[in-house]
Design a protein with these regions (language model features):
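Catalytic cores of RNA-modifying enzymes
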Residues: 1-184, 188, 240
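An accessory alpha-helical subdomain
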Residues: 162, 166-242
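Generic C-terminal helix-cap and adjacent flexible tail
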Residues: 245-247
């Protein structure tokens, strides 16, 4: 990112203040990190590339508010933070969101690939509607803000980008019997998004819940929404399905 004017807008969307500890994932050369350090109490600058980590430490040595952390954010222990303002590598976007959905935070502001961001709020039944849509709906309020011009990046990407904000839903919009199992269930059943529920759910019953083929067949015939196609179910319907399996 070579256009620093976008940093102010990102921090505005995050309502960043002097009490915040902010996570910057994929801190790179530290341009955004330095800007964040002027706005909040502390910044956790996480970078997986050891060469960039050395650059970060050289560039940010004069900022005691910044803690440079080397490693994959998905695999290492991270100190407590309450906000995220970041331009993460696009290839980790879905895994990063799943990781964040299991953390406590007040606000997350990210620059994401626009095509990916559209999946977060896709209408039920649409081409972009999928497991990520359902999990985002369950965990967070998601808002799309402004497009980010390709000229703001160096090198310029081939894809369009957009600023997105996520804020946790409290309480959750519906109840599920097991949050971790819900994630696995939705990911699993959407591999058969065009099939009817009674057929799409059988691999989950056999391979995850360890039901016999006979038990899976019997369960599939009695489930709610069994004759609906997976892609036509609303997020709440997936919660009802899992709860029915757990009852």
């Amino acid at each position: 990112m070579i256009e620093s004017s976008i940093f102010q807008r990102m921090t505005d969307y995050a309502s960043l203040n002097r009490d915040d500890v902010t996570l910057d994932v994929g801190a790179g050369l530290g341009f955004l990190t330095r800007f964040l350090a002027e706005m909040c109490r502390g910044v956790l600058a996480v970078e997986a590339d050891d060469r960039l980590v050395e650059v970060l430490r050289e560039q940010l040595w004069d900022l005691p508010k910044v803690e440079v952390i080397e490693g994959n954010v998905l695999k290492i222990q991270i100190p407590v933070f309450n906000k995220v303002v970041s331009i993460p590598p696009y290839q980790v976007s879905s895994r990063l969101l799943l990781w964040l959905f299991n953390k406590s935070f007040n606000s997350v502001v990210l620059i994401l690939q626009k095509e990916f961001a559209n999946r977060l709020t896709a209408p039920v039944g649409s081409e972009n509607y999928g497991w990520l849509t359902v999990l985002t709906y369950y965990h967070a309020e998601c808002e799309h803000f402004e497009d980010v011009p390709k000229s703001f990046f160096y090198p310029q990407p081939d894809v369009d980008s957009i600023i997105v904000r996520l804020e946790p839903k409290k309480p959750a919009p519906f109840t599920v019997s097991n949050r971790m199992l819900f994630t696995k269930f939705v990911q699993n059943i959407f591999t058969e998004r065009n099939r009817k529920v009674r057929n799409a759910i059988r691999p989950f019953l056999r391979n995850v819940l360890m039901r016999t083929a006979e038990e899976a067949e019997k369960t599939a015939r009695t489930l709610p929404f069994r004759d609906e196609r997976v892609r036509h179910l609303a997020p709440e319907d997936f919660g009802a399905l899992l709860n029915a399996l757990s009852s």
